[in-house]
Amino acid sequence: MKAVLWTKYGPPDVLQLKELEKPTPSDNEVLIKVHATTVNRTDCATIRAKPFFMRLVTGLLKPKKQIPGTEFSGEIKAVGKNIIFFKTGDKVFGFDDQGAGSHAQYMTITEDKALTIPDNITYEQAAASTEGAHYAYNFISKVDLKKGQNVLVNGATGAIGSAAVQLLRYYDVNVTAVCATKNIELVKALGASKVIDYTKEDFTKNEQKYNFVFDAVGKSSFLKCIKLLQPGGVYISSDLGYMAQNIFLPLMTPIIKSMLGNKKTVFPVPTHIKRSLLLIKNLMEQGKFNSVIDGRFTLDQIIEAYKYVEKGHKTGNVIITVEHDSKT
């Protein structure tokens, strides 16, 4: 099979497309013929091992898992003897933030990281639905939102931001989305009630006050956004921030929040992937959640895909279409 091989940390150029043996599922795994995967921010951070402490998970000196990729969709071709919920021929999708090995024609994974694809959803839509929504849901669920409150989403057209805008609709809050001019109509369609065009104004100088500011691209900071928050307001970033400040500041704000007007920042660790997948599957089945797709690459173009995502200007998700010939 064709697979992207990743044997050392570094920029996208360290990735190599190779011919490898098709994996064999263990007793607790399924073998998936991959039809679509993505390149996302998680993948880009992982191949570089930045920040450095990621290596505690991915491997200290070199990658433990040598095929990258976290999101996937495809068809089950074999199941281990302990598999209960899937059978050969099932169309499935899923996500593993610690590495699914999905940048390949075939992959294996445990059944808790996958779900069947709704009948009304394509392989591409399914593959692009998980990473952003998983992070967005985990972050949003850490805030006690109430009907009619005001929420600002910076980076509203990335994978995480576009998912957040859609999920926030179900809390019946007023969403202000920050995006570029070209994406104004998109974020309105996703559910934003107000839009700030960052090419024309600095959203941190906005006079509106918010109960929750969600920086879905990690390009701002708690200190820059603190004046946007109402008393008791919360700032969350999807990024560690400069010198990992978004980890350390949440440890400090409970102590000094009285001096900050009871404003605080938190940095939730995303958990419960299966819970996120079930939510997104349910919303997709009802036509209430749509994957935003920026563009498509092939496995042969994997380096170009990573470089494109690293530029930080994608709209939604970047798809990798995985082609198969009669032999695969």
Predicted regions and their residues:
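Glycine-rich phosphate-binding loop and adjacent beta-alpha segment
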Residues: 220-289, 322-328
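A glycine-/small-residue-rich N-terminal strand-loop-strand element
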Residues: 71-98, 174
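A short acidic, Gly/Pro-enriched loop at the edge of an enzyme's catalytic core
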Residues: 204-212
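N-terminal glycine-rich beta->alpha transition that marks the start or flank
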Residues: 11, 20-73
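Mid-domain Rossmann-like dinucleotide-binding core that forms the NAD(H)/NADP(H) cofactor-binding site
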Residues: 127-197
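C-terminal capping/lid region of NAD(P)-dependent oxidoreductase domains
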Residues: 288-295, 306-328
